[in-house]
C-alpha cells in the first residue's frame, strides 16, 4: 500500500510520523504524517500553503483524481462472529480497481479494529457494537484506501483500548486517520508530490465536533498552511430511509444534535477546504457544488455486509470519483460509480446505475437550483 521505509529514505522524503507498508499507486514513495499545529488564517481567502510546501505539480497546474466512500465495517466478532465469505478476501473485488487508480481514496471506519475487549456501550452484547478483526486492516489497505475517518458513533464501541487498537492497525497498514478528540486531529498523505490534508468531524462527545466552528476553522487553517489539497470528512445527520433528504438547519435524532450539515459544509469551504464528504445517515444523500467546490452530504453504507441494514436503498454503496484542479481544488468533473451491497459479500456492481440515479433525484429535490448535472451513467458535470 505504501512505500517501504527504505525506499522513502532513498527518495529523500522526511516526514514527521511515517507509516509504511506495501507500495501501490505507482512507483513514487509516499508518506503519512501528523499535522503540526499552526496558526489558522484570519478568514477564508483560500490561503495558499507556505511557499516551501507548494509542490511543483500544483504550481504547474493539472488535475488530481480522488475517490470517496461511506461507512466501512467489514465484519464483527462481537457479540458473535459475523464475518464475510472467504474471510473478506473478495469483499472489494468489484471496487479496488477504482480505488487504487485514484491519487487518494478515503472512507469512514465504522467500528473498532480490535481482536479483544468488551463493549463500553449501554446494553452490552445487545447493543450495536462493532469489533472488526485487526487482520482486516490489510484488506482495507490493499483495496486502495489512504485515509479513514474515526469521527463516528462506533469508533469508541470498545473504549479507549479499541481506539488505540484501531489507530495502531491503520498505522501499521499505512492508512492515515483522524477524528478522535485529544488525539490525532488531522493527517497529511503525500502522493506523487501532492500533499493531501485530511481532517474528520462528528457529533459524539469523543470526536472532534462539527458543531465547534472555532475548532473546525483552526484545524482547516492549520492544514491549509501545509497541504496542497484539504479534504474534510464528517459523520452526521439523522439515520435511516426516512431521512434521505437533506433538511435545512439542525438535525435531531435519538435526542442528539446530529448537526446543521449544510451550514457546516459551507463553513468548511469558506475557511479553506477543497472537498467535503459525509456519511452517517446509512443512506445516500444529495451532492452540491458550492463556490466551485464539491460536497457529498452522505455516501451511505459502503462495505457493511453484517450488522447493518443493507436492504433496499440502505444497501446503495457508491464510489465517488472526483477530478479537481491541482492549483486550487476546484471541481472539474466526476462520476458516481454505482454498487449495491450483498449480504456477506460486500459492494457489487449495479448494472442499472440505481445508486447514481438516486443521488441525482435527491440532488434535484433538495436544491432549488442545482449547479451539477448527473447523467444516467453517473457522470457528474457542471450545469
Give residue ranges: language-model regions.
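Acidic, metal/ion-coordinating pockets
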Residues: 18-383
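Bacterial N-terminal signal peptides that target proteins for export
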Residues: 1-5
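Bacterial N-terminal signal peptides
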Residues: 6-14
Amino acid at each position: 500500500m505504501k512505500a517501504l521505509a527504505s525506499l522513502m529514505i532513498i527518495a529523500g522524503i522526511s516526514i514527521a510520523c511515517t507509516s509504511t507498508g506495501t507500495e501501490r499507486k505507482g512507483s513514487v514513495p509516499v508518506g503519512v504524517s501528523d499535522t503540526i499545529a499552526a496558526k489558522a488564517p484570519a478568514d477564508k481567502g483560500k490561503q495558499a500553503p507556505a511557499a516551501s510546501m507548494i509542490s511543483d505539480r500544483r504550481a504547474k497546474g493539472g488535475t488530481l483524481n480522488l475517490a470517496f466512500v461511506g461507512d466501512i465495517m467489514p465484519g464483527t466478532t462481537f457479540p458473535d462472529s459475523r464475518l464475510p465469505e472467504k474471510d473478506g478476501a473478495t469483499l472489494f473485488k468489484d471496487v479496488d480497481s477504482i480505488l487504487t487508480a485514484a491519487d487518494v481514496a478515503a472512507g469512514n471506519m465504522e467500528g473498532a479494529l480490535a481482536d479483544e475487549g468488551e463493549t463500553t456501550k449501554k446494553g452490552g452484547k445487545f447493543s450495536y457494537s462493532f469489533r472488526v478483526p485487526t487482520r482486516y486492516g490489510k484488506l482495507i489497505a490493499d483495496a486502495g484506501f489512504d485515509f479513514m475517518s474515526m469521527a463516528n458513533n462506533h469508533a469508541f464501541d470498545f473504549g479507549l483500548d479499541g481506539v488505540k487498537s484501531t489507530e495502531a492497525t491503520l498505522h501499521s497498514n499505512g492508512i492515515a486517520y483522524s477524528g478522535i478528540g485529544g488525539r490525532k486531529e488531522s493527517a497529511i498523505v503525500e502522493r506523487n508530490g501532492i500533499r493531501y490534508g485530511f481532517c474528520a468531524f462528528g457529533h459524539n462527545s469523543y470526536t472532534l465536533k462539527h458543531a465547534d466552528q472555532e475548532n473546525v476553522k483552526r484545524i482547516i487553517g492549520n492544514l491549509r498552511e501545509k497541504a496542497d489539497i484539504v479534504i474534510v470528512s464528517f459523520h452526521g445527520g439523522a439515520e435511516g430511509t426516512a431521512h434521505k433528504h437533506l433538511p435545512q438547519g439542525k438535525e435531531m435524532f435519538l435526542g442528539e444534535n446530529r448537526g446543521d450539515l449544510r451550514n457546516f459544509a459551507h463553513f468548511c469551504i469558506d475557511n479553506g477546504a477543497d472537498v467535503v464528504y459525509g456519511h452517517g445517515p446509512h443512506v445516500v444523500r444529495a451532492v452540491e457544488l458550492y463556490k466551485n467546490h464539491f460536497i457529498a452530504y452522505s455516501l451511505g453504507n459502503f462495505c457493511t455486509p453484517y450488522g447493518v441494514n443493507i436492504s433496499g436503498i440502505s444497501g446503495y454503496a457508491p464510489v465517488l470519483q472526483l477530478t479537481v484542479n491541482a492549483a486550487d481544488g476546484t471541481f472539474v468533473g466526476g462520476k458516481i460509480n454505482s454498487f449495491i451491497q450483498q449480504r456477506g459479500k460486500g459492494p457489487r456492481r449495479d448494472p442499472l446505475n440505481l445508486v447514481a440515479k438516486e443521488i441525482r433525484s435527491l440532488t434535484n429535490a433538495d436544491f432549488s437550483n442545482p449547479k451539477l448535472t448527473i447523467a444516467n451513467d453517473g457522470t457528474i458535470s457542471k450545469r
